């Protein structure tokens, strides 16, 4: 899904398991578990973020056998230094995370995994539009985890985010629901994807959100040197 250079190593990433270590010539060395830190059943997200100030890698994982989501922080030398557990009794589709100043933001949409349906060969994803989406702001350096709620929506990818005047500002690609219904004739999805900007007030817990533009887009990115910081340009 993605490629990462961090701590003097080159990784190929996917969110279903351990990363693969590669050579500079892109030959596969094998699975990498950070010298035993990752256990069987662990994984790393395919879209981790690197703090431009400290060089730390911020990533995450979900396990089927644990009722929580784990945020992992790995220092610039590639050594795991902190794990933060976030209660999450239902397994949701969480594909990305975003660094916002001293916080890490996770979208927890009402798009849930149903392992029993998956084992029977049925559609394993449940969409519950009557359930609010939850936005989770996790302090990287300790402190209370903050929870926010908005009407249901779905998102695969962030663009960037930052902290300003007691608020977290997050730019991301918004969708109305999980996008697994396709038009069989054209191959195009039936719903649009637009850039949105969400603002979380850390004091009042108020959430505001607005569409940035009407352009259909995906795979939003920004200059990684400004990850988690105020920025001017994004690409999608």
Where do the language-model regions lie?
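Beta-propeller domains
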Residues: 1-236
């Amino acid at each position: 899904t993605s490629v990462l250079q961090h701590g003097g190593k080159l990784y190929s990433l996917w969110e279903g398991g351990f990363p693969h270590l590669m050579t500079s010539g892109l030959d596969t060395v094998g699975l990498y578990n950070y010298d035993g830190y990752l256990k069987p059943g662990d994984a790393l997200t395919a879209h981790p973020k690197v703090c431009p100030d400290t060089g730390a890698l911020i990533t995450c994982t979900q396990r089927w056998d644990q009722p929580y989501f784990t945020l992992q922080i790995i220092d610039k030398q590639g050594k795991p230094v902190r794990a933060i557990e976030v209660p999450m009794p239902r397994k949701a589709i969480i594909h990305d995370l975003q660094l916002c100043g001293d916080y890490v933001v996770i979208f927890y949409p009402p798009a849930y995994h149903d392992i029993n349906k998956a084992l029977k060969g049925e559609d394993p994803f449940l969409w519950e539009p009557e359930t609010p989406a939850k936005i989770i702001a996790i302090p990287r350096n300790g402190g209370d985890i903050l929870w926010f709620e908005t009407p249901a929506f779905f998102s695969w990818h962030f663009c960037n985010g930052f902290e300003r005047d007691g608020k977290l500002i997050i730019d991301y690609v918004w969708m109305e629901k999980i996008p697994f219904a396709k038009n069989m004739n054209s191959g195009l999805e039936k719903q649009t994807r637009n850039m949105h900007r969400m603002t979380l007030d850390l004091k009042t817990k108020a959430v505001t959100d607005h569409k940035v533009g009407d352009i259909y887009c995906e795979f939003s990115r920004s200059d990684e040197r400004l990850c988690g910081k105020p920025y001017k340009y994004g690409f999608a």
